[in-house]
Regions:
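The feature marks helicase ATPase cores and/or their adjacent C-terminal helical subdomains
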Residues: 1-465
Length: 465
């Protein structure tokens, strides 16, 4: 059994001191000047969260801190762990540091930069399941649940549909062995049998992988010690988006009182988009008590900051920076509209922009752009109450297509790159677009398999591979 070793904990990080020279070094690379508040965050190596308001440069600070740590990192088999809910953190490092030796070092062993799901898959669930005799074939919620759904007898599917259930019922929910069907009988047994057979064939949903991670951490104390010795420092980016179950897993993997791992969360509790959905939350877990705070937003001035503070979750108050438009005292605007006028809202917003700024100003700041932002992109009428309107961006703009909205699409699976490639070919008729997306996917696959940035991102993905 792996034994707890204090010398493998956070005490060994005391030899890493971030100095003014280190700060000057990273400023020269990033072309960014850090003030005293930001330097304090860069130098801090305690288990403290960073509450960063919009436009405060949180990502820049995190990337800078990682670069300094990677430069000074003395350990061969223990690394820095960076967790997020998307691949944005990794992409930022690839974008800003990917062509430097430090960037390449950060993106390879012994360090890990990835999503919360991929971390627990890689270091906990996959080894645990393999030790129990499972071979892993596929990890994908939609595909796996759909496959299980068609494993059910036709009569059972028909019965479930009449009870407003679909393939989403074909996965463990909240606990291993628990599904969203309480009634005992054949229907429940058919569902459980389908899940069991599917798992024996190596097919799991994303949530099931987290449930098996919890099972492993509950049973194996040596696993917890091993994770802490493997990663003496952990950063959680966009920490406000971590839900209660993920927080529980992180606390089991890196117990706060163990003194074996430093854990720092970076985020803004006022921007919690994904966390606690459908949860009865009594206490917000981020930031923890005594956070380091970045109050100054470089995104807008004090008039907007003061307005936003009135509806903010954070006890700390945000402050803005005066800009060239501050003296105009442009009115804050809220649109009230009837259901039949929804499609006019974007036009009205566009007119407001044209009335507020001159053509010269719009041209000067065209790089920043004017944007319409919404949370719900994909139309799912069957799951949304009819009385709820608007349901998403598509109700404001009839021609909206969700998969075109993200210019920097980075799917998690190779097949998704191929699907995008095929769709773009059909739309444009350009084979070069098809080849570009296929090459992007292959590059991502190679780097993911190697767990390092073997193939660098370039303007010509085909040439790069």
């Amino acid at each position: 059994m792996l034994q707890r070793n204090e010398n493998m904990g956070i005490k060994r990080l005391e030899q890493i001191q971030i100095t003014d020279e280190d700060v000057a070094w990273i400023e020269s690379i990033l072309g960014f000047q850090f003030d005293d508040d930001r330097i304090k965050i860069l130098k801090n190596l305690e288990s403290r969260d960073v509450q960063a308001f919009p436009g405060s440069g949180k990502t820049t600070i995190l990337v800078a801190k990682l670069a300094i740590l990677a430069k000074k990192w003395p350990y061969v088999n223990s690394g820095i762990c960076v967790l997020s809910h998307t691949n944005v953190a990794r992409e930022e490092i690839e974008d800003r540091l990917g062509n430097t030796d430090i960037g390449k070092k950060l993106l390879s062993y012994p360090h890990f930069i990835g999503t919360v799901h991929s971390f627990f898959d890689t270091f906990v669930a996959l080894p645990w399941l393999r030790s129990k005799g499972y071979s892993i074939n596929l990890i994908d919620s939609d595909l796996v649940k759909k496959s299980r759904w068609f494993m059910l007898p036709f009569g059972t599917r028909d019965f479930l549909e009449r009870n407003h259930k679909d393939e989403q019922i074909c996965g463990y929910n909240g606990s291993i062995g628990l599904i969203q069907w309480d009634k005992e009988g054949k229907t429940k047994q058919y569902i459980l049998d389908a899940i069991n057979k599917s798992q024996k064939n190596g097919n799991f949903t994303f949530d099931e992988m987290l449930l098996y991670s919890k099972q492993a951490l509950d049973i194996s104390e040596s696993l917890t010690i091993g994770l802490q010795q493997r990663f003496p420092i952990v950063f959680v980016d966009e920490a406000q988006d971590t839900n209660s179950f993920q927080l529980e897993l992180l606390s089991k993997a890196f117990p706060p009182k163990s003194n074996l791992t430093i854990v720092q969360g970076f985020g803004d509790c006022n921007q919690a988009i994904y966390n606690y959905v459908n949860e009865a939350v009594e206490k917000i877990e981020f930031p923890r008590e005594g956070p380091l705070v970045l109050k100054e937003s470089q995104r807008f001035d004090n008039r907007i900051a003061k307005l936003a503070n009135t509806v903010a979750v954070s006890a700390d108050q945000m402050c803005g920076i005066e800009n060239v438009f501050s003296e105009r005292k442009i009115d804050h605007t809220i649109y009230l509209f009837s259901k039949d006028k929804a499609k006019e809202v974007i036009d009205q917003f566009g007119q407001l922009v044209l009335d507020t700024f001159s053509d010269e100003e719009l041209l000067k700041y065209s790089k920043n752009g004017c944007h319409v932002v919404g949370m719900v992109h994909v139309k799912k009428d069957e799951l949304t109450p009819e009385k709820q309107f608007p349901k998403g961006i598509f109700d404001y703009w009839k021609g909206y297509e969700a998969d075109k909205a993200n210019k920097n699409q980075n799917p998690n699976h190779l097949i998704e790159y191929f699907r995008i490639a095929h769709k773009r070919l059909k739309e444009s008729g350009e084979m070069s677009v098809f080849v570009e997306w296929c090459a992007k996917g292959i590059r991502r696959l190679i780097n993911k398999a190697a767990n390092q940035n073997l193939v660098e991102a370039t303007n010509n993905p085909l040439k790069s591979i």
